[in-house]
Amino acid sequence: MTKRVLISVSDKAGIVEFAQELKKLGWEIISTGGTKVALDNAGVETIAIDDVTGFPEMMDGRVKTLHPNIHGGLLARRDLDSHLEAANENQIELIDLVVVNLYPFKETILKPDVTYADAVENIDIGGPSMLRSAAKNHASVTVVVDPADYTVVLDELSANGETTYETRQRLAAKVFRHTAAYDALIAEYFTAQVGESKPEKLTLTYDLKQAMRYGENPQQDADFYQKALPTDYSIASAKQLNGKELSFNNIRDADAAIRIIRDFKDRPTVVALKHMNPCGIGQADDIETAWDYAYESDPVSIFGGIAVLNREVDAATAEKMHGVFLEIIIAPSYTDEALAILINKKKNLRILALPFNAQEASEVEAEYTGVVGGLLVQNQDVVKESPADWQVVTKRQPTETEATALEFAWKAIKYVKSNGIIVTNDHMTLGVGPGQTNRVASVRLAIDQAKDRLDGAVLASDAFFPFADNVEEIAKAGIKAIIQPGGSVRDQESIEAADKYGLTMVFTGVRHFRH
């Protein structure tokens, strides 16, 4: 019996050659629309889909393959006489191979000028239906959705006259992943169009970007996936210019660092980060000086860390950076001279370019946190805050210099692991106290790190002080200005302690836990 293949593809790469080889093997080819035109023009004999269905394509191609003569030919089980008898009685010829890829919905909605009508028109109906029918009946039917699989299918058909069950099963699994992702993307688009923020069913689709050597530790397997609709301002979208592949920990740290630098848009800024915590943030009128400040914040912890800059890296800055062991440098761009300095002296240094013109768009993305058996979803902590909304709760008002430093510190503390404390001046971090299980321990840690640089320093806390002992420690160190959310039932005790020691304390009313 002559074998039949149905070919209907939007991605025509390699399809002519594939069809020509099938013809050499004696296959009949059914085809549709533009695919049939392409094959006919290449001299490949095909059967029109309406010759199989006995029904013309209609409604601008919306209805062409949704017909029993197609789906009966795909779904009939070859091991059931009743199925074969039904096919014979209804003059349905069996289809043994389906080669289909889908309307380019993703590519359509990524166009800047796409209309809603364009998006709707590029939702494929017949294609997924054929793919799913063929995949369901993979015991008998081979289904191909990816041109990368043409070669293996041809090799097996040439060698054995048919594909192996293992190949058909693998290709069926790929199809169900593909159609599920396709539908998930459509669902995501429509959910956004109707403004539904808390759907009862959450469907997400991501594409494999990088198979990783291992995860957080060598004994853990890991892979890196990118959103099917990419976010421009993202570590997943950064362009790597030099160095080894990013590791699992590199990616997590880089993501944390570029989130931090989003909040420092106005002036040249450098963020140094290690193990998801900032170890140095420097801000100045030029990027070279900003690097100096970030490095001086903690010259020890920056070793083996990440540096993110929000301005182009010039040669002078590159000369200073190359003398420090860094895992990654991320910047919007690099001068040719700067790139040459970094690459020539650091062959394995991971150098990434990430334009900063899409920062705002990145802030609207939801955050997903996996738990065993579930997924937590929240919006990002990107609330717009203004010092005009803050409240000075002590008798003493901050000086102009203290006010500037407090604003800088408040931006920085948001990214320190809780319980988080940070000590800064108006242009650089001086001490970081992250992740302690009691707040006073974080206070002591940050102050100890700042040591002899406390003159004129201020302190920020990511959450309220539960007891006045925190203020006592701060006053003892000589720090005169504090910024914190407030909100404790014992706030008054902290205020009275601050007044007692002549401190100024600002309440922001916004907590910034980070776990």
UniProtKB/Swiss-Prot annotation:
Species name: Streptococcus pneumoniae serotype 2 (strain D39 / NCTC 7466)
The reaction(s) this protein catalyses: (6R)-10-formyltetrahydrofolate + 5-amino-1-(5-phospho-beta-D-ribosyl)imidazole-4-carboxamide = 5-formamido-1-(5-phospho-D-ribosyl)imidazole-4-carboxamide + (6S)-5,6,7,8-tetrahydrofolate; IMP + H2O = 5-formamido-1-(5-phospho-D-ribosyl)imidazole-4-carboxamide
Pathway: Purine metabolism; IMP biosynthesis via de novo pathway; 5-formamido-1-(5-phospho-D-ribosyl)imidazole-4-carboxamide from 5-amino-1-(5-phospho-D-ribosyl)imidazole-4-carboxamide (10-formyl THF route): step 1/1; Purine metabolism; IMP biosynthesis via de novo pathway; IMP from 5-formamido-1-(5-phospho-D-ribosyl)imidazole-4-carboxamide: step 1/1
One Gene Ontology cellular component annotation held by this UniProt entry: cytosol
Keywords associated with the record: Hydrolase, Multifunctional enzyme, Purine biosynthesis, Transferase
One GO term (biological process): 'de novo' IMP biosynthetic process
Domains: entry comment: The IMP cyclohydrolase activity resides in the N-terminal region.
Record-listed E.C. numbers: 2.1.2.3, 3.5.4.10
Disulfide bonds: none
PROSITE patterns xrefs: MGS (PS51855)
NCBIfam families per record: PRK00881.1, purH
Protein name: Bifunctional purine biosynthesis protein PurH
InterPro entries, per database record: AICAR_Tfase_dup_dom_sf, Cytidine_deaminase-like, MGS-like_dom, MGS-like_dom_sf, PurH-like
Name of the gene this protein is made from: purH
Record flagged with keyword RNA-binding: no
Sample GO molecular function, one term: phosphoribosylaminoimidazolecarboxamide formyltransferase activity
Coiled-coil positions: none
Entry similarity comment: Belongs to the PurH family.
Record-annotated MGS-like domain positions: 1-145
UniProt keyword NAD, yes or no: no
